[in-house]
Amino acid sequence: MELLTGLISSLTRAYAGTWEGTSPGRPAGRTFTPAQQADREREVDLLMEKSLPRIDRFRGLEESERARYAGRAHTALGKLLMDGPDPRVDRFFDQCEATGKEFVRRAREFDPSLSGSDIHQALRNQWVFNSVEVFLGGSVSLRPGSLAYSLMYPYTDNWLDATGHTVGEREEFQESLRRCLEGESEPGDTGTFPRLVRMIEEEFPRAGHPAVYDALLAILRAQGRSLRLQEPLEAADERTLESFTIEKGGASVAVDGMLVRGRLTPAELNPIFGYGVVLQFIDDLQDMDEDAAAGHSTMFTRACAAGPVDENSVDGNRGTSLFDRE
């Protein structure tokens, strides 16, 4: 446990250093002209026009079917936005679509009360798991561990993110999850979280795969620390905010890696952790307006309060945008 904890702490510091040391200018690499951007926008508009006649039918579907169709729409959009046809990418998206259909069926089988948005939230992690599978040289699949871990998101994140819970209630909830992940729940416990943990145990028995459970406990700890971000932070807490964000994002995808292999070398964990950091940044960027309205502190809400997040300077002064972290 200490080894993985130390690795995650080290990677958190390393990626924080990378973030802080990144130039505030635009990154090197390919750029797109306004004409190329307009072409892509037209292709997206065409896809939307083709989809409009199906909206009424979509609204009449059961929630599980709606989640499945939303997954197919994301697959189609992903293919469209890739830079030209690539058989490998097309194959990956097609395999993810097939996996998504089975995921929706099994999620509904596990809990018929899950909403379409809950299933889609869980499905997003399943696709992250699939991308890690391919990165590690495997094939796209749906496994008991990936299904269970993905379904933990709507059951835990949504409860912890909801307003109205006291600090004591949140701590008690976190403690109950910790005990379950450490194997302290009763064998006959029919609660949702114990059932999900048992699904992971069926694929990865505790005796032979301690790293899997160490990783799950690591994301639980990171999740608990990140609850501080639901309160406004003082300017002096910028580094704390940065550290919590990076740790939570990296640790979440580290679990996916462990569920692919059962264990990872430090060299394998490094890029997978970094992948999780990037996904966390994207998530926080997408949720920026919602988080700001709720009073949650993220790197993006803080930057937004200081000025436009997509500009390198405001009124000629550096230090007022997300891309300047000095």
Model-assigned labels for residue ranges:
Residues 1-37:
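Intrinsically disordered, low-structural-confidence terminal and linker regions
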Residues 7-10, 14, 43, 47, ...:
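Charge-rich, solvent-exposed alpha-helical interaction surfaces
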Residues 10-25, 50-61, 79, 83, ...:
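Surface-exposed polar/charged interaction patches
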Residues 18-23, 42-48, 67-70, 163-172, ...:
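Short, compositionally biased low-complexity segments
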Residues 36-52, 143-151, 155:
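Amphipathic alpha-helical protein-interaction segments
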Residues 54-105:
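Low-complexity, highly charged intrinsically disordered N-terminal segments
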Residues 86-154, 158-174, 180-292:
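All-alpha helical catalytic cores of prenyl diphosphate-utilizing isoprenoid enzymes
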Residues 267-326:
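Active-site/pore-lining binding-face segments in mid-to-C-terminal subdomains
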